[in-house]
Amino acid sequence: MKIAIDAMGGDHGARIIVLGAVEAVKEYDVNVILTGDEKILKSELSQYEYSKDKIEIIHCSEQIKNEDKPVAAIRRKKDSSMVVALNLVKEKKADAIVSAGNTGALLAGGLLILGRIKGIDRPALAPVYPTSKGVSVLIDGGANADCKPRNFLEFGIMGNIYANKVLGIEEPQVCTVNIGIEEGKGNDITKEAYKVCQRGPFQFKGNVEARDIPLGYADVILCDGFTGNIILKLTEGLATTIFSELKKAFLKNNITKIGALLLKPSLKIFKARFDYSEYGGAPFLGVNGVLIKAHGSSDAKAIKNAIRQGISFVNNDVVGDIVSEIESLEADFIE
């Protein structure tokens, strides 16, 4: 198996991406193709010991930066590390792509280069969301600010397959985010989405309120990308605030410091539950290929886990299952 990695993407440059790739080839049965500036990549790789036949470099003369306009960058920067990596997947020279680069450009590239799965109107980001019961899949995490009711059905199908095949959740419970659990709650879109999802090929549980999401009420959480991104960002900010306030409380005096020392192992486990690097990245579901979007500020651990995620998607043929499920839908679900 080969994973293409956009080695020039991310906030920390090639150093972190290369280290994550090296750790991945040591731990997993995978080969990696690094796309980017050959001189920089060779310099970074020279610092580590690894099986030389496990990592390949493809030189790219261009780089898509965070300030670049997504669609224009994909169309104009043909020799950028991101575009080259996407084309490797399209041409079947790589089984998946991992990138921590410009999110808008990566999603645009996924659509323009890999293309949509037939029957999927809106591909979507599907990050995992930590809960008191484990993790849930939240879809859409930010790719589509506005959605139609039928998009919720597509999200449910894709999220259900992801939760089952990759996360190992038996018969995932699927819910739509709403301001109340009753069927008649919400706006016109969410009301109609509820009706459509009731007929979907998955275990539809109904609506879920935001307060119940962290409690693990649903295994797959359906919402438009605007709502999903707000949920994610609010949770990230809240987690950061909680840990910051705990730190202040534990450092207040010598007694609290002793308490902190005793609780350190448990606090470490608790903090890891909210650490995005533990989960890797968010898959862009609905395109013809495995595309994993890693966080822009990913460390080496996050990159390694994003590669692991890509491996799992390929091994479980998630894309193939989505294609089959969409093809088997009745025409009135899609039209």
Swiss-Prot record:
Gene3D superfamilies: Isopropylmalate Dehydrogenase (3.40.718.10)
Pathway: Lipid metabolism; phospholipid metabolism
GO MF annotation: an example: phosphate:acyl-[acyl carrier protein] acyltransferase activity
Gene Ontology cellular component annotations, sorted alphabetically: cytoplasm
Subcellular location: Cytoplasm
Reaction it catalyzes: a fatty acyl-[ACP] + phosphate = an acyl phosphate + holo-[ACP]
Pfam families, per the entry: FA_synthesis
EC numbers: 2.3.1.274
A GO biological process held by the record: fatty acid biosynthetic process
Keyword line: Cytoplasm, Lipid biosynthesis, Lipid metabolism, Phospholipid biosynthesis, Phospholipid metabolism, Transferase
Subunit relationships: Homodimer. Probably interacts with PlsY.
Function: Catalyzes the reversible formation of acyl-phosphate (acyl-PO(4)) from acyl-[acyl-carrier-protein] (acyl-ACP). This enzyme utilizes acyl-ACP as fatty acyl donor, but not acyl-CoA.
Family that this chain belongs to: Belongs to the PlsX family.
Protein name: Phosphate acyltransferase
